């Protein structure tokens, strides 16, 4: 059985960038193993935030590989993401990893997947994981209708809170990082 399930949400808003993730780790489809996992982390001298959804062991492998790429390309987020995606897609061992990453710095927000995709959203919002669609919808509504009164970190936190009320694989122990 694998450990997985989570929700990660990221937003760029009013010159700031924030990412939030819940703390639930689920064994299979029915057992919560941990409530306080930290799936959002700062990398590269605290200039980059990365969050993962999927298999925990696979995600840690990808974090290490991504951080190595960031160091290799001196913090160039886009180049590091593209290089990781290429390696992930072409390496027979990495190709079996079951996880997705959202990575961001102050200027750029990207989704990185094992199929070789590196996607930058049109609206500055991304969400992945079991509650990703709920968080995405909530985040878009918050940004669109309350954006003038909320900071990026507040949009991220509230989007995750709403997702946790709907998705059984997402809890309300939320970690938020902001740039």
From Swiss-Prot:
It is found in: Cytoplasm. Gene3D superfamilies: Glutamine Phosphoribosylpyrophosphate, subunit 1, domain 1. GO terms for cellular component: HslUV protease complex; proteasome core complex. The keyword Transcription regulation does not apply. It comes from the Bacteria. Its main location: cytoplasm. Its EC number is 3.4.25.2. Allosterically activated by HslU binding. One of its GO terms (molecular function) is metal ion binding. The active site is at residue 6. GO terms for biological process: proteolysis involved in protein catabolic process. It catalyses: ATP-dependent cleavage of peptide bonds with broad specificity. Keywords: Allosteric enzyme, Cytoplasm, Hydrolase, Metal-binding, Protease, Sodium, Threonine protease. It is an enzyme of class 3 (hydrolase). Na(+) binds at residues 164, 167, 170. Pfam families: Proteasome. Protease subunit of a proteasome-like degradation complex believed to be a general protein degrading machinery. A double ring-shaped homohexamer of HslV is capped on each side by a ring-shaped HslU homohexamer. The assembly of the HslU/HslV complex is dependent on binding of ATP. Belongs to the peptidase T1B family. HslV subfamily. This is ATP-dependent protease subunit HslV. It comes from Listeria innocua serovar 6a (strain ATCC BAA-680 / CLIP 11262). The gene is hslV.
